[in-house]
């Protein structure tokens, strides 16, 4: 089947590039130990509720639900899995979960091994997570599974004439909680009616983040009452645009928090800058005052940094298929 072949090829590709790239290398290290980690940390006879998020953004979207369930059902244990290192590396010590680990690649053998170990009493997949083999196996084992804060668009493969396989993937969900009425209508057209519109959980999380935001004295010194533009989770095409603007407007300061914190990418950002800059991990009270651009080269600060910007930008990656293939 094409899907399983694509997963195998992706797995091979990650292994091939891991020696040369930091992010795939971290992912593979996490995958190598995931089953042993589960054997060591799973509590015998405990009941686990499993949450899966692709990355940090999806985790933040599902976090209000995780914490409400944690508070309401304290006898249950929480398992949190990530696909991306940018989620796992930041939240591997998240206190709202009992176990945090990577999700093994969606190959049938991995799926059976993972579910045999965890045996969750229910599962929540956040937003765009539609892993076929996991969902098929959960349905086969009669484990309730829910899609949370999902959003659907007309161009996704589920709504194409050739998308029957992927429509069946959606039918594995016991219920789908979507962000808007349009998503509900699209699903109804393909016969999926176990759907509820609940809005965007990011708004709940934004209010929570506002209460939890940390003071960052170095960022305050950098800003120094100057018009500051914050670019969060940026990618190279975004950076080309706002760095060009920044270079031509000396009255504006810039804070860049790139999605990929890789040394090669950071060097590429620096190469484009024509004004003084400093990296956050190398900043002090003296050099941060002289900089016009602050590069955030570490994880975990972005939610606290946005409030320092007069204008903020966050890149939202478009998922044309709505699935990881």
Feature map (PLM): residue ranges:
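Membrane-interacting alpha-helical segments
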Residues: 2, 6, 10-17
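Active-site and donor-binding regions of nucleotide-sugar-utilizing enzymes
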Residues: 15, 19-212, 235-236, 259-261, ...
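Short, surface-exposed amphipathic charged segments that create phosphate/polyanion-binding patches used
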Residues: 115-118, 210-215, 269-271, 289-297
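Glycine-rich phosphate-binding loop signature in dinucleotide/nucleotide-binding domains
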Residues: 117-119, 223-224, 308
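Donor nucleotide-activated moiety binding/catalytic core segment of transferases
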Residues: 202, 281-312
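Conserved catalytic-core segment of nucleotide-activated headgroup transferases in glycan assembly
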Residues: 58-69, 215-283
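Conserved small/polar residues in nucleotide/adenosyl-binding loops
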Residues: 314-321
């Amino acid at each position: 089947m094409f899907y399983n072949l694509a997963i195998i090829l992706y797995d091979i590709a990650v292994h091939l590039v891991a020696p040369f790239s930091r992010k795939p290398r971290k992912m593979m290290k996490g995958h190598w130990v995931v089953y042993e980690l589960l054997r060591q940390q799973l509590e015998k006879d405990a009941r686990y509720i499993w949450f899966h998020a692709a990355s940090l953004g999806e985790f933040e979207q599902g976090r209000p639900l995780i914490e409400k369930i944690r508070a309401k059902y304290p006898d249950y244990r929480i398992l949190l899995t990530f696909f991306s290192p940018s989620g796992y590396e930041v939240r591997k010590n998240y206190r709202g979960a009992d176990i945090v680990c990577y999700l093994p690649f969606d190959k049938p053998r991995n799926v059976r091994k993972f579910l045999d170990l965890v045996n969750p009493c229910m599962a929540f997949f956040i937003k765009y997570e539609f892993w076929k083999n996991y969902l098929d196996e959960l349905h086969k084992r009669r484990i309730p599974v829910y899609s949370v804060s999902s959003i659907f668009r007309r161009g996704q493969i589920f709504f194409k004439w050739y998308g029957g396989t992927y429509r069946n993937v959606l039918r594995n969900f016991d219920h789908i909680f979507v962000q808007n009425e349009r998503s509900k209508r699209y699903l109804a057209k393909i016969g999926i009616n176990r759907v509820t519109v609940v809005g965007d959980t990011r708004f709940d999380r934004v209010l929570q983040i506002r209460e939890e935001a940390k003071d960052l004295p170095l960022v305050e010194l950098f800003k120094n009452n100057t018009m500051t533009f914050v670019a969060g989770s940026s990618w190279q095409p975004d950076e080309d645009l706002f760095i060009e603007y920044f270079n031509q407007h000396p009255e504006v300061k810039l804070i860049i928090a790139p999605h990929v914190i890789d040394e090669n990418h950071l060097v590429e950002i620096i190469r484009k800058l024509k004004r003084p800059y400093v990296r956050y991990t190398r900043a002090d009270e003296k050099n941060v005052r002289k900089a016009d651009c602050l590069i955030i080269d570490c994880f975990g600060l972005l939610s606290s940094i946005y409030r320092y910007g007069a204008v903020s930008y966050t890149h939202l990656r478009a998922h044309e298929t709505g699935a990881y293939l």
